[in-house]
Regions:
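Acidic, S/T/G-rich, low-cysteine, solvent-exposed domains in lumenal/extracellular/periplasmic regions
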Residues: 1-4, 10-11, 15-346
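Hydrophobic targeting/anchoring helices
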Residues: 1-40, 52, 344-407
Length: 407
């Protein structure tokens, strides 16, 4: 295969990349949310390979491992596999959800039922915290957001769908300079521990942030749009980090800890799911012996230069935010980030030059209300005045003709 391998974690109840086809007449099968558009876009550049930590170690052939919305706990042994993968100078693309969304049973009275949001802890959080990054247990609400407009002219802001403008997107990278708008959904803010970042000599770069008119929803989460009200205290509004890129020689989380034992069930190699040569997840090649391990403990305690991209949502990967051609800002950002993590920054730069989406400038509420008022009231008044003017002209002309015949 001429394409580089891109690892995708298929264990731990991550978002399904490309589901197996369901039986043709099985109408009772539950609907499986998947990332089919992302799978199609990336399959032209990469060969997706499954990484199942319960079956096999992460192959050395991967340059980048994607972890999208895990919901099951990671054992210490599995965290060790991820930690040591990073120590080898590899990259992690982590799309981490802070809450598990539990939908209510459908019934005749549930049209207004709100899903229950429970805090989600998988163990991956402590690994990230060791590297100096934390994902907060809250959602970002933003006045700069998607607005649902009704046929009657009414507007309903969807605060948990922020629309990031050019000022909130890091423009220091050549592959992000032409991206002027990104849509987010149910994003948790991030925190950087500057003391750890400095002590480990890492570089943390903020890639995305909310607007200055954003706030956090924590505790009891309720995402019914008409129930969400902005805070009255202006001090609660502030821009907050939504995505970070951390680079450098990461220290191992297990340096001063007892090494976890390999589970017995991993002693016997089991085949991973293979979905065929259609750009979907395939079985990885067996891992080669690790020649980098030189420490007495049998692990790498200080890694080669690696990268972590971390964002507090997996919804940005879903089909409703991407296009099939890969020219939308959201698709462009994701493709470019994964290329950068995989050492293909030149491809990301070339792709970014083809960015054609240039949104019109945002109008202020006063301007929008003025235009609405003019359309509703101004235009009818103009028509009335025009009618009066035509009537007056006709009356004057009629009077002039009468005066001519009197002579």
């Amino acid at each position: 295969d001429i394409n580089d391998e891109l690892g995708y974690l298929t264990s731990h109840d991550t978002v399904v990349l490309a589901p197996h086809l369901l039986p043709k007449f099985d109408m009772t099968a539950p609907k499986v949310e998947s990332l089919q558009k992302l799978n199609t876009l990336l399959s032209s550049v990469y060969t997706f390979k499954a990484a199942n930590l319960a079956l096999n170690p992460i192959p050395d052939s991967f340059k980048t491992l994607m972890i999208a919305g895990p919901k099951q706990d990671f054992s210490d042994w599995e965290l060790l596999q991820i930690d040591q993968f990073l120590m080898k100078g590899k990259s992690l693309a982590i799309f981490l959800d802070s809450f598990r969304e539990i939908r209510q049973d459908n019934n005749a009275y549930s049209s207004f039922d709100q899903p229950v949001f429970l805090p989600l802890n998988t163990g991956l959080e402590k690994l990230l915290d060791h590297y100096g990054v934390r994902v907060k247990k809250s959602y970002i609400m933003d006045k700069s957001c998607y607005v649902n407009r009704g046929q009657d002219g009414s507007e309903m802001p969807i605060y948990f769908v922020p629309i990031l403008k050019e000022k909130q997107i890091n423009q220091d990278f050549s592959f992000t300079k032409n991206i002027s708008e990104i849509v987010m959904v149910k994003n948790s803010p991030l925190e950087i521990d500057q003391e750890k970042i400095g002590r480990h000599k890492l570089k943390a770069t903020q890639m995305l942030a909310s607007s200055d008119k954003s706030w956090e929803m924590a505790g009891k989460i309720n995402l019914l749009p008409y129930m969400i009200q902005p805070p009255t205290d202006e001090k609660e509004f502030a821009g907050r980090p939504l995505a970070y890129l951390v680079e450098g020689e990461f220290p191992s989380y297990f340096t001063d800890k007892p090494l976890p034992e390999k589970p017995q069930k991993q002693e016997e190699e089991k085949p991973a799911d293979e979905t065929g040569p259609t750009g979907q997840v395939q079985k990885p090649a067996p891992a080669a012996p690790d020649t980098h391990i030189k420490e007495e403990k049998g692990i790498i305690t200080r890694g080669k230069p690696g990268k972590i991209f971390i964002i507090g949502t997996s919804d940005i990967l879903r089909d409703n935010l991407l296009d099939e051609e890969g020219v939308s800002p959201n698709a462009m950002f994701l493709l470019n980030i994964l290329d950068y993590l995989s050492g293909k920054e030149d491809i990301a730069n070339m792709r970014s030059k083809n960015q054609k989406f240039n949104p019109i400038g945002e109008t202020k509420p006063f301007t929008r209300n003025l235009i609405k008022t003019f359309n509703i009231v101004g235009l009818p008044v103009l028509f009335i005045l025009l009618g009066v003017f035509i009537w007056a002209r006709r009356k004057a002309k009629k009077k002039m003709i009468q005066q001519m015949f009197k002579k």
